[in-house]
Amino acid sequence: MEAIKGSDVNVPDAVFAWMLDGRGGVKPLENTDVIDEAHPCWLHLNYVHHDSAQWLATTPLLPNNVRDALAGESTRPRVSRLGEGTLITLRCINGSTDERPDQLVAMRVYMDGRLIVSTRQRKVLALDDVVSDLEEGTGPTDCGGWLVDVCDALTDHSSEFIEQLHDKIIDLEDNLLDQQIPPRGFLALLRKQLIVMRRYMAPQRDVYARLASERMPWMSDDQRRRMQDIADRLGRGLDEIDACIARTGVMADEIAQVMQENLARRTYTMSLMAMVFLPSTFLTGLFGVNLGGIPGGGWQFGFSIFCILLVVLIGGVALWLHRSKWL
């Protein structure tokens, strides 16, 4: 591969443009720098910025189909070999505080032995871990190590989010044992988050597995083994997601049963109350007709005796319901 001049990739509004120093650190890219396999360049762009979009559309360093892919709409994770380079699309957890984490952020990467071009629109939180290591001098030393570290950070964040969802399910199951029903829509949102994670993490696991199996010239055998470990770790996370989805289905049935039992209990209570007061309602209605005068209306103790009879009648009905084991 021919060397690349720093001026060819120094985009003014880039998120950052760095050169890997080969010792785990980075330095800012200068126009006079020479980019080769010993000192690769990492160019990170926000493709909606004007200068970045113009560079992506006009640079001769990228194949034509790569330009469109790096600035296109979000797609599912995939990997494509394009001559000496590789185009990779990955998804990561959304770290923005005003959006849901399951609204995954897309990151697209084109890389060969000399150049790493990564693009995004929303911030990729997992890259902060890689950037921190590079600034401390403990980061990757080449393109293969960079890709492994990025995939490892993405998987760490995904695993943390899956663990958070798992903890929510455990709390929900404990509450259901105490007959506590979650707020409306809570279980549906939880299930949607699991399904979205399953949709994107499954192909991302396949991307990791393919990167581990293919003989990329800029990846060593040790880096391929690490990539396979990352794929296996994400696969275990997918197994956890599948188990959580099944558990949410069981909980939905349990919630429906609890609500049905509560409704039946309330209906039964109202029916018993109607049975208790039905005889007294009949008598008060009968006396209230008053077609031929109220019986005992002229007697000073008539109303009191009538009230006592109603209380005795209600007590008798309640006693009968209790002995019949209805109450």
Curated annotation (Swiss-Prot):
Positions of transmembrane segments: 274-294, 301-321
Catalysed conversion reaction: Zn(2+)(out) + H(+)(out) = Zn(2+)(in) + H(+)(in)
Q: Which organism is it from?
A: Escherichia coli O6:K15:H31 (strain 536 / UPEC)
Give the bilayer topology.
Multi-pass membrane protein
Residue intervals on the Cytoplasmic side: 1-273, 322-327
Q: Name one Pfam family in it.
A: CorA
Q: Name one GO cellular component term.
A: plasma membrane
Q: What is this protein called?
A: Zinc transport protein ZntB
InterPro entries membership? CorA_cytoplasmic_dom, CorA_TM1_TM2, MgTranspt_CorA/ZnTranspt_ZntB, Zn_transp_ZntB
Chain segments annotated as coiled-coil in the UniProt record: none
Output the superkingdom of the source species: Bacteria
